[in-house]
Amino acid sequence: MKILSSLKTAKHRHPDCRIVRRRGRLYVICKSDPRFKARQR
């Protein structure tokens, strides 16, 4: 999982990527390609 300051580029990496908010943090999850997971600081 990458830790990024901005998730704008991360959400465009793959068509299946979506932004989720969990426990006050923003995550990018990708079901079909899990290597694109990311979290915002």
UniProtKB/Swiss-Prot annotation:
Molecular-function annotations in GO: structural constituent of ribosome
InterPro entries linked: Ribosomal_bL36 (IPR000473), Ribosomal_bL36_sp (IPR035977), Ribosomal_L36_bact (IPR047621)
Keyword set includes Transmembrane helix: no
Pfam families in the record: Ribosomal_L36
Gene Ontology BP, a term: translation
Entry keyword annotation includes Ribonucleoprotein: yes
Domain of life: Bacteria
SUPFAM superfamilies: Ribosomal protein L36
Keywords of this entry: Ribonucleoprotein, Ribosomal protein
Gene Ontology CC: one annotated term: ribosome
Family label: Belongs to the bacterial ribosomal protein bL36 family.
Protein name: Large ribosomal subunit protein bL36
Gene name tied to this protein: rpmJ
